[in-house]
Amino acid sequence: MYRHLSRILIAAFLLMTAVEGTWGIEMHRNPLMWAIAVLMMASLAYTIRESIIKKRSIAGILSHTGMFLVLLGSLAGAPFFVDAQVRVNPGSEVRQAFSRDGETVPLPFGISLEEFRADFYEDGVSPKQYTSRLLIDGKEFETSVNHPCRHGGYGIYQADFGSENEEYSILKLVHDPWFPIILIGLLLLAAGAIWGLKQYWDSWLALAATGITAVAFGAISLARINFGTLVPALRSLWFIPHIALYMLAYSSLALALVTAVLSGFSNQSQKMGTLSSRLFNTASSLLLLGMICGAVWAKECWGDWWTWDAKECWAAVTWLLTILGTHLPGRWRERSTMALAFIILAFAAMQLTWYGVDMLPAARSSLHTYR
């Protein structure tokens, strides 16, 4: 019974995430979404207990425990999460910031701007880095894009800056005391995904061969990126693994679709179907690893590991479709038409995530435009 409930919860969460990622309606503030998350935690707790008692796969235990901790940290930490902005001018100390709703947020310290600096590439036009030198409670700190400073329980992030005629810096201040719980959950999810990759294949050699094929497909998409003049937000150690994992995931999903279609015309349909299933599961793990890299990067860049951005939402929808496909009853997964349907849905969501999100209404305020 609980397995059917878990599938319904995943589907409901998926649909609400798709709505937010398409129209920008804040479904994550809806009490129904919170109720679904609480029920998912209960379902995960039961699954973890059953998996330990029945000695099921380690990958499953790690993944379900990780997801439980991510939801726990997000729900329990929401009342204590502070996200505010402040404008600081040279020589002028401020002790309060403002939330997204315009409410005043008192700060436990005073902060002022000593110097703002913009660095450019050799062309003199493309920005390379933005840096603010700050004075906080009499001590000097420096914050720049992807390199926040920390003081008094707050992460201080470079958010914006003034025009050429007026020097000031806009900082984002984030207080997130429950993030360590979320981070542990993300690490367990990553461990479960990596462990699962080995289970999908008979040997590391087979996995490596598939990986090389996927890399060849992924390189085609990576070739269009200009690495020479990356904007400050993209100048991060997480950029390459984040993009590479997604390219591998997308390539694996494309290969899963190709093999699933070919299985209908092959005299070795069972082998082709098994290969398609393995590729589909591999894509699911790689999508999760790509999202985790993106989440840690987002925390480093703008202070929030998940912002319900349009691109984030549709990346999650793609992953949730693969999760829903792998959580179907065995008799459904054995039907080639059902398996093909989920592969097609996930592939379509993947295409929308990669190419079509910028055309959606929710993308107007997207952080992934890097303007």
Give the ranges of each region predicted by the language model:
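Solvent-exposed, non-transmembrane regions of integral membrane proteins
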Residues: 1-371
